[in-house]
Amino acid sequence: MASVQDIGLSAAINLLSAFAFLFAFAMLRLQPVNDRVYFPKWYLKGIRGSPTRSRGIMTRFVNLDWTTYVKFLNWMPAALQMPEPELIEHAGLDSAVYIRIYLLGLKMFVPITLLAFGVLVPVNWTGETLENIDDLTFSNVDKLSISNVPPGSPRFWAHITMTYVITFWTCYILYMEYKAVANMRLRHLAAESRRPDQLTVLVRNVPPDPDESVNEHVEHFFCVNHPDHYLCHQVVYNANDLAKLVAQRKAMQNWLTYYENKFERKPSSRPTTKTGYGGFWGTTVDAIDFYTSKMDILAEQEAVEREKIMNDPKAIMPAAFVSFRSRWGTAVCAQTQQCHNPTIWLTEWAPEPRDVFWDNLAIPYVELSIRRLLTTVALFFLIFCFMIPIAFVQSLANLEGIQKVLPFLKPVIEMKTVKSVIQGFLPGIALKIFLIILPTILMTMSQIEGYTSLSYLDRRSAEKYFWFIIVNVFLGSIITGTAFQQLKSFLEQPPTEIPKTVGVSIPMKATFFITYIMVDGWAGIAAEILRVVPLVIFHLKNTFLVKTEQDRQQAMDPGHLDFATSEPRIQFYFLLGLVYAAVAPILLPFIIVFFAFAYVVFRHQVINVYDQKYESGARYWPDVHRRLIICLIISQLLMMGLLSTKKFAKVTALLLPQPILTFWFYRYCAGRFESAFSKFPLQEAMVKDTLEKATEPNLNLKEYLKDAYVHPVFKGNDFDRPRVVDEEESNPLVRTKRTSQGTTRYNSEASSSATTTPVANNDSPRCWGTKIGSFGCVIVVSYSC
């Protein structure tokens, strides 16, 4: 078991690493040549200009103003000065609420830490139990935990009381935060400027119709069922193959630019490359001519694929983005069932255009359930197969236990320096390496499930990552570490003593998690602000690919908050804090340092660096709240299991109401606040519509929305929001091919070969009829009389 010296060595290594990263960042950010790496957000907003312009050769690369080096740490107070309303306007509500999670950790754990150190640490330290257990490995750190309290001792009343205090305080803080974030979201939606997703719904599983194409069928359905609010629609094309060609052509363009720049710098000889994969083997050819011909071939293939998509009816998917004249009409459509058959004409709020994950719109709806079932099974096996490397990592953290099984390693293990490095540093860094490859796997699994927005993919990946951390990193570290450490004791002692050994050993894993917090939460956060990889990539691109100022702008990689990995990682720290607050309070100060340090770092990154891929209006908060409740319930269950091994089982029954009350609290919060994150109140929608009509009476919504949800490959390089045109276009009658079946006396007088449906001209007289549509839906048909 890691001792105080081991933890001290680990703390020294990680603190030195963190300070080294911070010092390097403070120096690098001051250099003009790195300005686009450490302040890209201001460049994207057009506020900041390049400091390398109008300077001498030396000052373009190095900052020679010594006064700036004196204030090299001024980025910290600057990160804290921007008020929250300004932060929301500058970076978006998603980023502002994400920062609040770190602040939530401080609000929750600072009072708990003070109380735990004032009450539980003296109770645990004076227990004097570990010395009386034979063949048990422990250190002075473990004497601060509940393991040092003798079984059946009345001292456990302090721990039981503390668990109730932690539960009520945590629930209070979570309630206040949920309420605050819900109000922030409602204010954000009320004050938000017009966006295409406010007026658009995504319609999926459009049923086939023998008389009409998908395009006509969608238009008919919404003209009839939403006659006063339907405006226009955009059907979804399967353009995945075309998107791959566009990506290949972009990659070829980068290589062509590289060789053209190389030729400009050295015009005496033309650059060459090889025709094999990556240019490493094959016939040597002229590089510029080779990539130019590649570009021409891909351009021809793109043109053929575009023509195929536009002319092939099979390329049109049974889905569409349908836009409405008002937010009120959009809310009604998005939040109601469109047909008596609940499996067709499925509507949901459309993600904003940059949030759409276009690849998954081409997946047939009937495949989604099968895909999600298979993904769930695959996730189950992934979680439990990952226990193998986790067990190996834990073996590194329990070398004393290995000595009992592999005594020939004892001479090496007993070397003081080797032992301290391995136990205090290696387990945390090894576990971190294993976890690096995991997010990519989980995101791929979420994409296979078929979700249609980047924000929802992040939320689903975060859910998978959270459960992976719970099972493998937390429970796996405790179970495998405990079993390996006490293997010999388990084989020699009576079966009735095994629960006692497990109960005593679980708190002793706090030392491992302390090392992990220092590696991931201290040094890892400091490495985040240094941005080593974006720094190197920017300078490589700037050297070999940049020809114009626009190229230099594209070479910047501002990055973004990766909710799929960062959220579960934060919640893991919440779990550790809640579990060990009443078990081993020594862990709490390390968690507080993490939350405080991460709050400053990520606030700086959000203000100066990150450019989010989408804005969901903090729609992920119910997931954050739910997972924190799960962490709280896990801590309660583990505390009950732990006390049941301490000859305190009868009194432990007093803890049974805790998880029940916590679940009731979760249900109450869900009923009270969750609708604010999934539905748009009709009252608020009407208010925004009324204000918009009063302030912009001539707004042409159809022009504003017509290109908003066109696949980006059909837009070229322009994926910006379409401009607002103030001149209203006329809306002609829509000619259809629908023939009447089961007609009434009104529509029997209408022409059966071709009918028209008024879309916008509400003054035209109408005749109404019904048609038995696909899957038995009765569709009312409107005709010009």
UniProtKB/Swiss-Prot annotation:
Region: Disordered, residue numbers: 725-761
Keywords linked to the UniProt accession: Calcium, Immunity, Innate immunity, Ion channel, Ion transport, Membrane, Phosphoprotein, Plant defense, Transmembrane, Transmembrane helix, Transport
Subcellular location: Membrane
Spans traversing the lipid bilayer: 7-27, 101-121, 156-176, 373-393, 425-445, 465-485, 510-530, 582-602, 628-648, 651-671
Domain of life (superkingdom): Eukaryota
Modified residues (Phosphoserine): 54
Pfam families, per the entry: PHM7_cyt (PF14703), RSN1_7TM (PF02714), RSN1_TM (PF13967)
Modification comment: Phosphorylated and activated by BIK1.
InterPro entries the UniProt entry points to: Csc1-like (IPR045122), CSC1/OSCA1-like_7TM (IPR003864), CSC1/OSCA1-like_cyt (IPR027815), Csc1/OSCA1-like_N (IPR032880)
Assigned GO CC terms: membrane
GO MF term (any one): calcium-activated cation channel activity
This protein's record includes keyword Ion transport: yes
Membrane topology: Multi-pass membrane protein
Start-end of Polar residues biased regions: 739-761
Substrates-to-products reaction catalysed: Ca(2+)(in) = Ca(2+)(out)
Function of the molecule: Calcium-permeable channel involved in plant stomatal immunity.
Protein family membership: Belongs to the CSC1 (TC 1.A.17) family.
Protein name: Hyperosmolality-gated Ca2+ permeable channel 1.7
Lineage: Eukaryota, Viridiplantae, Streptophyta, Embryophyta, Tracheophyta
